[in-house]
Amino acid sequence: IMPFDVEHDAEQPLGFLMANRDGEKLVFITDSYYCRYTFSGLTHIAVECNYSLRILDENIAAGRVHPAMRPRLLRSHFSLENVLDFLRANDMSKVQEIHLLHLSDNNSDEALFKRKVQEVSGKPVYIAGR
């Protein structure tokens, strides 16, 4: 297990790269809005996908989310858009499956997130239980 720094507004947030003797490698990232690292040889990805910028902005415009929440979300949680960029930046050739974690109750859409991640990755995508 190898910890690595991730971006978040809390102190010392970490992601983890885990490998086993069979050559499987899992990257686990949650409570982060960005990962500066790229990984090769991953077989499994478990990554936060908390909100969509579009959905968040629609909820702010409709009064369902206070506008003051937007800057904090942008600096503390992975958006769908950043997750897609993260996946594009990584070697996906050995990835067997992707698990999306920590979806927002109000600012996410499970079906949309699953479809978009599958389109970008070409891999099976699962939504973690809430």
Language model feature labels by segment:
Residues 39-129:
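Cap/insert and terminal regions of metallo-dependent hydrolase folds
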Residues 1-44:
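Core dinuclear metal-dependent hydrolase active-site scaffold
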